A protein has these predicted regions:
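A structural signal for multi-pass alpha-helical bundles of membrane permease subunits
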Residues: 1-207
Length: 207
């Protein structure tokens, strides 16, 4: 709490980092400039929430699909090892992920450009140099790294569903779609909400 309150306190002053002892009070002037005079801030806010919404939506969908697959194969011998390999992107630091995809998306030497050129005949361009391709790239990279996190949460949720509900659904003749929509998804909504909150906090840090 103290760092947050101290940051709010400092925001009410005009100062240089090298001369903090000479700061002078300006009140809400910094906020006034930020909200009403800065053209970049609203765009940054819009882009941040657009990227967050898109990334989290993709992560929930893909995470649930992956969680469902691992839930169905949980009794197979090597399922735990496969799950461990799947969650490895979470362990990578943002710097490492950024450098890897910087090379992958390089328009001259990147493998992505090579595939687009040789397979689809699309001429390489600066994927991170144009607004729309850059946003799509960030969403894709963000989703790639954090979908396993959502998968682990939703898999934990699926593990909490009582076997009695599956047995009752089987007796009633419910198909896989009814089981998924009437039993599994309602049972893991709290896990989805937890994942959304945690990921939203992480995505806002992109700002």
């Amino acid at each position: 709490i103290f760092p947050f309150l101290y940051s709010v306190y400092l925001s009410l002053f005009q100062a240089k980092l090298t001369k903090m002892h000479k700061k002078f009070f300006i009140g809400w002037e910094n906020y006034q400039v930020l909200l009403f005079e800065d053209d970049v801030f609203p765009t940054a806010i819009k882009n941040t929430f657009m990227i967050a919404f898109s990334s989290i939506t993709i992560e929930i969908i893909l995470g649930f699909i992956m969680a469902k697959i691992f839930f169905e194969i949980r009794h197979i011998k090597f399922s735990n090892a496969l799950r461990t390999v799947t969650i490895m992107p979470i362990m990578l630091t943002p710097l490492c992920v950024g450098l890897v995809f910087l090379y992958i998306l390089n328009p001259t030497l990147g493998i992505f450009s090579y595939i687009l050129d040789t397979v689809f005949g699309i001429e390489p361009f600066a994927y991170l140099g144009e607004p729309l391709p850059a946003k799509i790239s960030i969403i894709a990279i963000n989703s790639w790294q954090w979908t396993p996190f959502m998968m682990i949460l939703l898999l934990a949720g699926l593990m909490t569903v009582p076997n009695e509900q599956y047995e009752a659904a089987k007796i009633d003749g419910a198909n896989w779609f009814h089981v998924m929509t009437k039993i599994e998804i309602p049972s893991i909504l709290s896990f989805v909400l937890l994942g959304v909150v945690l990921r939203l906090i992480e995505c806002i840090r992109l700002f």
